Amino acid sequence: FGIIALEELTQRRLSDLVGCTLSSWRVLERFDAAKPEVRVFNPDYEKHGWQSTHSAVEILHSDIPFLVDSVRMELNRRGYSIHTLQNSVFSVRRNKNGELQEILSKGAQGADVQQEALMFLEIDRCSSAGELKVLEKALQEVFSDVRLSVADFQPMKAKAKELRAWLDKAKLKVEGAELEEVKVFMSWLLDDHFTFLGYEEFTVADSADGGTIVYDEKSLLGLSKSLRTGLKADDTHIE
């Protein structure tokens, strides 16, 4: 509760605060990094030991960039208001079965130490079990996209650096001022002003009636691995 205003905490019943804390603890007790935990439910006193007029979202994921922002964006896209958001990063040790062995001091390092992000949110109440499941699935898909982008961020940045270097040597039929503007823009992107999410490579092959755009399936990085351009034959011809 470190990031929650005291005024908000004092408005909650102690039993509900204890209940949601124990619920999050149960999520933390066992974890497989290959299968991030996402749970969306309507707290019920009989089932969960606490209650809320909102739906609860519990998330446990290996700590990587963009997690919180991605959750917010997906919930906003679906029209859910966020009433409570708690996010904590833990340094932990687990055994080979994923069972929690130790919570270490913040930022602790070591070969057997994992950094894990635990999130708890309360959002507009979902009206049915089906809606809860749909939201769980949507958040899992969002995290899958985040992992793709994070895993390939450095390779995508390297591709951008290659392109920037190529511009210094390329003999292009464009005005010098225009080419210089492109170079400056590429350098600005590479100076940590842009988050690379996906990469796809196209080449142009000459043909008798003009040219053809060739889509390199092996070039895909980041989100492009799941969100492909999917050019149709009519889209690849250049007159």
Q: What are the roles of these predicted feature ranges?
A:
Residues I64, R125-S128:
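Helix N-cap motif at beta-to-alpha junctions
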Residues F1-E58, M73-N76, T84, S88, ...:
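Charge-rich interaction surfaces and accessory domains that mediate macromolecular binding and assembly
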Residues L67-R72:
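Ser/Thr-Pro-rich, acidic low-complexity intrinsically disordered regions of eukaryotic RNA-binding
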Residues S81:
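Residue-level detector of anion-binding/catalytic polar loops
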Residues S88-K106:
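Beta-rich nucleic-acid/ligand-interaction surfaces
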Residues L104-L118:
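A structural-propensity feature for long, helix-poor, extended segments
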Residues L60-F66:
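Short, surface-exposed ligand-recognition loops at beta-strand->loop->(often short) alpha-helix junctions
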